[in-house]
Structures are given as C-alpha cells and as structure tokens.
From Swiss-Prot:
GO terms for biological process: mRNA catabolic process; RNA processing. It is found in: Cytoplasm. It comes from Pseudarthrobacter chlorophenolicus (strain ATCC 700700 / DSM 12829 / CIP 107037 / JCM 12360 / KCTC 9906 / NCIMB 13794 / A6). It comes from the Bacteria. GO terms for molecular function: 3'-5'-RNA exonuclease activity; magnesium ion binding; polyribonucleotide nucleotidyltransferase activity; RNA binding. The keyword ATP-binding does not apply. It catalyses: RNA(n+1) + phosphate = RNA(n) + a ribonucleoside 5'-diphosphate. SMART domains: KH, S1. The keyword Glycoprotein does not apply. Residues 656-728 form the S1 motif domain. InterPro entries: ExoRNase_PH_dom1, ExoRNase_PH_dom2_sf, GPSI/PNP, KH_dom, KH_dom_type_1, KH_dom_type_1_sf, NA-bd_OB-fold, PNPase. Involved in mRNA degradation. Catalyzes the phosphorolysis of single-stranded polyribonucleotides processively in the 3'- to 5'-direction. Its EC number is 2.7.7.8. This is Polyribonucleotide nucleotidyltransferase.
Amino acid sequence: MEGPEIQFSEAVIDNGRFGKRVIRFETGRLAKQAAGAAMVYIDEDTALLSATTAGKHPREGFDFFPLTVDVEERMYAAGRIPGSFFRREGRPSTEAILACRLMDRPLRPAFVKGLRNEVQIVVTVLAINPDELYDVVAINASSMSTQLSGLPFSGPIGGVRVALVADENGSQWVAFPKHSQLENSVFNMVVAGRVAGDDVAIMMVEAEATDNSWNLIKEQGATAPTEEVVSEGLEAAKPFIKALCDAQADLAARAAKPTVEFPVFLDYQDDVYAAVEAAAADKLAAVFQIADKQERDTASDALKDEVTSSLAGQFEGREKELSAAFRSVTKHVVRQRILKDQIRIDGRGLTDIRQLTAEVEVLPRVHGSAIFERGETQIMGVTTLNMLKMEQQIDSLSPVTRKRYMHNYNFPPYSTGETGRVGSPKRREIGHGALAERALVPVLPSREEFPYAIRQVSEALGSNGSTSMGSVCASTLSMLNAGVPLKAAVAGIAMGLVSDQVDGQTRYAALTDILGAEDAFGDMDFKVAGTSEFVTAIQLDTKLDGIPASVLAAALKQAREARLHILEVINSAIDTPDELSEFAPRVIAVKIPVDKIGEVIGPKGKMINQIQEDTGADISIEDDGTVYIGATNGPSADAARSAINAIANPQVPEIGERYLGTVVKTTTFGAFVSLTPGKDGLLHISELRKLANGKRVDNVDDVVSVGQKVQVEITKIDDRGKLSLSPVVAEEEGAEGAERAHATEPAEGAEI
C-alpha cells in the first residue's frame, strides 16, 4: 500500500538456508478513526489489519479489565466464497477463536493494572497466501496497533512460530514456517515475549508435535522433541522476538499517540490491606493447611466473613476493598509458605503428585470410556468411532479442509460445585479441547492403519487443577479401551510457578500438579503433555512480565518426571488396545482400480445403492480408489467387500478359497506365499506344524523354502486386506476335493 501518510518499519527474519521472511508494519492509511491501527504484511502476500479502540468511560460495576480480542476471517482473503447457506461469514471458526486466545494471553498482562475502560482489538485477515499461518502474525499486529493507540500498554510484544524442520543437512528451528514446511517438521511452537534488558522474557508458549512427527522420528531418524530440544527452541525464538519488538518500537516512536491518562481503579488502598493482614494473616496460615478443597474453602469463606464484619465499621462503604484485600493477603500467605517452607496448600512438597486413579470401560454400550482422577480433578473420556465420511468438514482460511480426530471438552458448572450457564462451548472450552487434541494427534494411527473417524469427548466432572491435562490422560485410556491402536500412551501434567522476594532475593519455586488455588495465586500455568519419549504439546501462560527461559527449562524436566509416573498408572489400567466394541461399526478398506469407480457406483448410483441395501453396509469411495465399508457387524462388511470385489477386483481372493502358491520370502515368524501376481499371504509359523506332522517348528526354513509350491487356503482377511493362510494337507484335499482351488496345476500334483 502506498501514500505519503504511510509510515512503516520492517523486521527481517533470517532462517539461514531456509531463506528470509520480511514482516512489515504500516500505519496511517487505513482505519484512521480507531485509536490505533496497523497493517502487517508477511512477504507482501499476506496482509492483516489490526485496530485497537477504547471506551471513553470506565465500565460501572466491573472489578476486572474488560478486554475483548476478535479475529475476522474474510474468505475473500483466500479468493473464496463462504460455503454457508447465505454465502457470508458467520460465527468465527475454531481457528479464529484459537487465534484470539493466542493474542489475548500475552497482551492482557501488559495493560496497566486497574484499567476498567473497555478495550477491543479486532484483527481482520484481508489477504492470505494459502500456505501461510496468520495467527502468529496477528499477535504482532495486535501489539502494534495497541502501541499506536495511546493506551497504557507496556509493549511491544513479539510473537513467532518456530518449527524444527528437517532436511538433508539436519534439523533447524525455522521462524514463520509455512504449512508445507510443517510437513517435514517434528515440532512447532508459538512463542510470545518482550525485550527485558539484554534478554527476552517469555510470556506465552503454545506448542505441539506435528501430525507426522512419529513417522519422521521413528522411520527417518529426525530429532525427537525432548525437553532439552524444546528448551533449545525457546532460546532459538528469542532473536526473532527481539527483531519483531525492535521493529514495532521503531514505528511506535515515530507514529504512536501520546499515552492517555485513563482512570485506574485499584482493588484496595494500603490502609485496608494493613488492617486485613493484621486481622487475618495468622488465621489464614492455619486455614491453608487444610488438605480437602471443600473444607478449606468453607473455612476460608467463614474467616473472610469474620474479618470483613469486624472491619466493616472502620471502613464503611469500602466492602469491596476489604474483599479484594483479603484475597491479596491470602495470596501472600500461600506464596510465602511455599517459598520459605517448601510446603504447599494441601501439605504436599513442590514435586509431589496427588493420588491418581485410572479406570476403563466405565459406561455401557459406548465404544470406549474411561475415568481419570488426580486428587479432586475427575475427567471422564468417551470415544466414538464411525466411518471416515463422518469426519469434520472445515470451511476456513486454512488449507486443512477435513479433520478425522475431533476432541470436544465440556466444563459444566457443577464441576466446581457452582451454578452457571449450560450450552454452547465458550472460548475456554474450545481452547482446552484443542490443547488435548494436539497432545494426542501425533500418536494416532494413520487413516490407512485405522480407517475410522474418531470423536473424543472429555467431561470435566470435578475440577481442582488442570482438567485439560486430565483430559489427555482420560482420552488415552478411553481410546485404548475403544480399540484405537495408539502408537504410544500420552499423559499430561500442569506445572505452576511462584516467585517473590524472600530476604531481599527473588526466588522461584516450580510446582508439580497444581491445584486450582495454586493456579489462581501463582504466576504461571505451564501444561506439558507427551509420551515416555518426547513432548507432544505445551501451553504456557504467565501473569508476570516474562519468565526466564532457564526457569522454564527446569520446569520442563520436573514435568517429565511427573509424566512418567502418570504413564505408569495409565499402563497399569490398560497397556494395549482392547478389541473393538460390539456396538462399534466395522470399517474395512478395499482398493479398486480408479477406472472401476464408475462401475461400482453404477448409473445414478444404482449399483452402490443396491449393495448397501442388500448388505446393510455403508460405503464411501475416495478419489484414489480406496473404498471404505462400514457396517454394524463383520458379516455385513464382508458381504459388501465381496460384492465390490466381484465388480472391480474379480481376481481378489476371498476367505475359504484355495491356491497353489509359491513361497517368495521366509521370516522368523512365517513364510510369505504368492497366490496371484501382486497378491501375497502370510503362512504363519504356527500353521507350518501341519506340514511337519504336527511337530513344533522352530525354523521356517526347515519346512519350506523360497520357490517351493504350497497348497494353501485363505483363513482370514484383516481390515487392511492382509491375507492369513493355512496349508492344505493331503488328507484334507482327499476328503474335500479341489473344486474351490484356483491352482494352475492339479492340487494332487503339488509337491509339499
């Protein structure tokens, strides 16, 4: 965009052999009536407009900062018309809601404390390269427009996504990766922070292992995202954050409005705090040694009523200040006990985990279910399986158009013993569900290995600290109970941080498995999920201006010890996938030639509809010729497969058919036998006993050899079309005849 009124600055992000990215900040041309507005470009083909405005007067009766952050995804940005009935954008997509949360979390702590004027930040996606991720650009755009607005905001705040991308020269942390680059990365994380002296203080982290990370690590030898590697990624993000902050500061120095004096409403005055502290501090220390949450809350509420009543006459009309001061004194008492005595609210040490309970198959008829309990936090996980055509269709600016694994998180008000609204999910519930989903996606089987759409629901039945990480554990249990062949079990833990001045020094204490109160009174909520080998998801929020990376690195190591302990509990409840529930649909895959798709469908769908009607199966066909067959039972699915093969694959073997095959390979567990060109089956070592007069076979080569002809019968075809074989011995052949054999030579002449 051009014009004499435009002022700009640029941040050049150098990724070495992966090239450079240019982030350009502009102001002065668009949205001139907003308090602050900025256009932000990445490489000139993705553009976002951020506008920050503030209410003229403080909101009456508000005891919190009313900040609203919104993202408007315009489909014209990608050259598309919305797919809704009215062909117009409606409610925000899940991606937009998650982007709002990414922006809100680092920005909110940067506003002056006590601000009660409404502040709204709106980021509109005006143009986007389909290969770009706009969410991290939006963090910088919202920070830039807020800096320009004249609001009491201690920015700038820079945000960057870094991905551990592998190529022939090794792995490197790449800033602002594209969607296509993420396919070759094992881990990516969004890191937001601010410049603090000569360093960068980290304010927010959102990280995940990628969908393809397991294959890249196990099959291609890529670097696994261990705690040490993740810590290196946090350090790698710092120079990029500094470059972004410097560019914002440069433009703000030239174009920002003078900071406006807004009325600030402190929660209490010093005289109120001193009176409450004198009346309540010693008693609070005793109250917060009660381990049970409900007993502790009851005692705390009673003490609060006692203190406010006794001081009401002294501070008439200042009841709200008394209540706020009581909370602040409570916070100070709890934090000082942790830092000085290394003892927490419920009497645990800093690294102690509450009692854990894991149980599977807790509901009848559902496909998979489990309950995971950590102290008073109780999560029920429920898994539902269906055909792939039931996967979620996505209409957003992302190139991802469908999602096979859907994770929904519900947080009813009774989970904390309260009343409240029940209905559509709020942003918090959407965010928690997305976090649990990201933690589990890396260990899910591929579509080919497990051709099912998977819906996982986490019900928070009781809450006292980290229901999102409890959801990860419950989901692992539930999916294994449903028969989902996870590549590894995943567990999650929430870490906390308390920092304060003790004897003139700043001390940090990292807490394992935080309570709800420790989350409220602490400085950090740091959630880490992963397998026994590596990290799969991270979420960090802080109330401080930033946290040293060294403190986060230590917390990561502490979280790993807790995660391994939780995984032991999960494995003791269930360590391998169960059989599919009798109530779950049976989904099998058949591969047919692409030029046969029309024949299977038939004119106006006549053939496929007839097969579905005759067998009771549900059939869907992919463009590559993969046919997915779903049915309520195995015989229906097998009947549909036979009908499809009769049309498209007339030479495809079926159960019970006999072949004179040729041994093409021997292994320690059996021999592979070629039945027809391109179609092999496994003759397991346990079946070879029939060829050795019933004797145990220890060495396959002692019974059969490559090139030998063997008469076999197909005994099983699994969901992926793999064939299991059994040898046909002379007695069976003589008794039953060879009328079903598909041999090119008479069965009697076969040399075994």
